[in-house]
């Protein structure tokens, strides 16, 4: 009897974790508390585009302890929950995973550059399901770009240049133009002064 209990306990425990069941067939687990349809649409399209680009990321949004099923003790512990969830969804192969909670993020399976980018992410701006989804939209874009798989063409998703800071490459050009303009202006001033003091005839 004891042996039978030990054998069925792991599967029963897994079934008690809603995200692990959902993520086996979908890219995103949403909290039980409603998430704005627009945010869901954007995040779904973004993760689909990321998968197509070679970055098949699974995302779990955890807004309340009830979203964790039989393991509410892992609420507000995004990395610990990511470690647990990874074991539940990676039995067929390693999965790229992002967990989003109000106090931060947890990750598993990411390449080093994306893991580093995840450590620099700012926590979500709020605690609602929609705010978690909005934070995930920005996070997925940054992680995909850091991993070398930028997401393009998805409305509502930050561009890769915005996500990685590569947009700052225009700064040196602007500085160069300003310096050139200043030098030209200074040259004109000097030329006019020389013409003004030149003896007549």
Feature annotation, model-predicted:
Residues 95:
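Conserved acidic residues
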Residues 1-92, 105-201:
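A structural boundary signal for the start of the first folded domain, especially the loop/turn
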């Amino acid at each position: 009897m004891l042996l039978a209990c030990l054998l069925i306990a792991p599967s029963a425990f897994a079934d008690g974790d809603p995200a692990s069941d959902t993520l086996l067939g979908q890219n995103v687990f949403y909290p039980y508390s409603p998430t704005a349809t627009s945010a869901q649409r954007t995040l779904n399209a973004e993760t689909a585009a990321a998968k197509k680009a070679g970055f098949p990321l699974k995302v779990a949004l955890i807004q309340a302890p009830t979203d964790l099923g039989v393991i509410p003790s892992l609420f507000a512990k995004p990395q610990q929950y990511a470690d647990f969830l990874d074991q539940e969804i990676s039995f067929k192969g390693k999965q790229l995973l992002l967990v989003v909670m109000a106090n931060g993020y947890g990750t598993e399976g990411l390449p080093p550059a994306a893991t580093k980018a995840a450590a620099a992410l700012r926590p979500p701006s709020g605690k609602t399901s929609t705010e978690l989804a909005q934070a995930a939209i920005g996070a997925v874009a940054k992680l995909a770009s850091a991993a070398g798989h930028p997401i393009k063409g998805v409305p509502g998703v930050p561009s890769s240049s915005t996500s990685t800071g590569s947009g700052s490459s225009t700064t040196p050009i602007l500085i160069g133009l300003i310096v050139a303009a200043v030098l030209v202006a200074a040259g004109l001033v000097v030329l006019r002064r020389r013409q003004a003091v030149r003896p007549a005839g």
